[in-house]
């Protein structure tokens, strides 16, 4: 794909991520709050608080993967694979906290 060409599914992915950010603001905020708590924590609390952060990120990642997969299932296999790559890349740019393991879901 040319660097000057917009991704094929960019518009639908933008709308999906807009919807995620509106409907799941609590999940995004919780992950941010958990990370802030971990960063402020004393050493003896840090491990548990990091686990809480990871759990919050996993929740967001699962929700995003569900959105991706439900749309992907409406496409043929080749287009579905292209859409999945574009979706995962868009999550990495827009919501990087939730992108680290999205390709594993």
Give a label for each model feature:
Residues 11, 40, 52-55, 85, ...:
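Intrinsically disordered, low-complexity regions enriched in small/polar residues
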Residues 1-38:
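Short terminal alpha-helical segments
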Residues 6, 39-53, 73-84:
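Alpha-helical rod/repeat scaffolding segments in eukaryotic adaptors/tethers
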Residues 72-105:
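Amphipathic alpha-helical binding modules
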Residues 24-68:
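Amphipathic alpha-helical interaction modules
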